[in-house]
């Protein structure tokens, strides 16, 4: 049976009002609890670049902002048997979704979504766990589009490939990059990265075999030489003209695959032998997206099934200490601090850090 928990009549949440202004809403509705989910009191949230873009055509007035959360279970749906009240969980939300406007991470209470959540490992803080969800989801989607398998959570060592296979990760000091490089290593691939020199050690700590200064004028040739002109895979975690151009130029003579985290400038995608695609975060739920073109997507059962498999794998890897979190900048101060953190992210004031805000 469902464990009874009475939510307050209202809660506080961060939203965008009818004037397209990010607003702290103190009389926001509380979500209802589906039978196959749990209700969570949010203790910490992490900020992502996508949070700062939910304005204009991407905004549903008074829908909740926020993707990444961690918190304490306060109620359990009738069909859930493996979670109890008091357990700690972390997960991702489909923020600013018109179908479920009261489900966003930046709120006092939320309900888990699909199977895109997991229990917080022993020894992890809420802040550490909250930093993972978007990175896990995006890293998994990127590997899928690159055509690379997810790690085997039961393996004691990474598989030995017949010959070294390099994967270029442009923007190797970003939060998504540090997770995907760890996953690539666990799948047997060799990540090489680009970033600023002051973040070289960060990228190497999280799996990069070697790191290159993204500002090097001869970088494409340097990477071609390093990979013996056989680079087949490039993941672009920055996505601008310079990053797309570099990735296409670095891929070897036989061609390969390029994946970015946002729509890439097509005029920079100059080689027919390179297949290009980009990730869209909400597809991890299988729900599709109602955002304007080119971000609109239909729902997909295959996407939903992949999201569940990814999170089953990633939860094990995190639990076993095979994936570690990005360096954090933890900010106290609740919802006002979220607004301040969003400004830090929007204006590009971070390097090698992920902003996490304490709510609890």
Curated annotation (Swiss-Prot):
Pathway: Polyketide biosynthesis; lovastatin biosynthesis. It comes from the Eukaryota. Coiled coil: none annotated. Its EC number is 1.-.-.-. GO terms for molecular function: nucleotide binding; oxidoreductase activity, acting on NAD(P)H. It holds the Pfam family ADH_zinc_N. Monacoline K acts as an inhibitor of HMG-CoA reductase involved in cholesterogenesis. Its hypocholesterolemic activity might be useful for lowering cholesterol levels in the blood and reduce artherosclerosis and coronary heart disease. Dehydrogenase; part of the gene cluster that mediates the biosynthesis of monakolin K, also known as lovastatin, and which acts as a potent competitive inhibitor of HMG-CoA reductase. Monakolin K biosynthesis is performed in two stages. The first stage is catalyzed by the nonaketide synthase mokA, which belongs to type I polyketide synthases and catalyzes the iterative nine-step formation of the polyketide. Belongs to the zinc-containing alcohol dehydrogenase family. Monomer. This is Dehydrogenase mokE. It comes from Monascus pilosus (Red mold). The gene is mokE.
